[in-house]
Amino acid sequence: MHKIGIDLGGTKIEGILLDEKYNTIQRKRIETHQENGYDSIVKSITSLVNELKAKTNEGISVGICTPGVTNANSGVIKNSNTKCLLGMPLKKDIENVLGYQIVMENDANCFTLAESLLGSAKGYDVVFGVIMGTGVGGGIVINGTLHKGRTNIAGEWGHHTLYPNGNECYCGKQGCVETYISGTALEKRWLELTGKKEPLQSVVQDLSDEKAKQWKKEFLENFGISLANVIDILDPDIIVLGGGVSNIPFLYDEGKNFVYENVFSDIIDTPILKNHLGDSAGVFGACLITDEHYQ
């Protein structure tokens, strides 16, 4: 059986067709066009699936990687920073158009599964995968299988409370991790401190003045406390970082030290590594979730 994986992102939708050995047959990327609304996204996804399906005569399985979690009871999307998806039965609507069942999972779980089986965490038993981009998400893989929890929210460390009564989050809570260490939050904090609106990749090029040092110190402290809490609860064999924020080099030395300083144990050597698959993790993870589903 061949596999189609779709990665639905905030700015792009990527699709891939793989054979049984995970060799790429066809790959395509299109724009998401959130401004055109929910129905446009459903149409774009189903059209891309049909286009990829036409490239093979084999049977197919389809997996879709989405921002946000599918509510286990109602089947609607929640906790998505792609706001037009919120409250919508995305899986059901796609299946109605295609005429067959698909598998759907959130982007952090797809990322973690892909990195566990094909990437930086290959060979480790208990893996915590982190996405720090527009938002903050996490996933847990144990012995090669996703651990999703009773209500599909296992690993959602981005909505742990870092500061009670802190920054407002789109989820309705205050003080969520996401509102402090996502790329969006970091750029917002930089603007507050300096009055400059700059992309994160520019900000980290020069952190020599006092405001920049303050920004970095706050970031490292929040990163360290947030991940230390995960280690205290899960004690994973490895943590893999993904998303645009994961490209910041100092997270892997200074950042790791801040994590270690805040962990309960005095014996701590948890590897904290950068992802191997880059922005391909989503589509590969979408294909891999179909393996889990069809076992």
Question: Where in the sequence are the language-model features?
Answer:
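Active-site glycine-centered loops adjacent to acidic/histidine catalytic or metal-binding residues
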Residues: D107, G133, A286
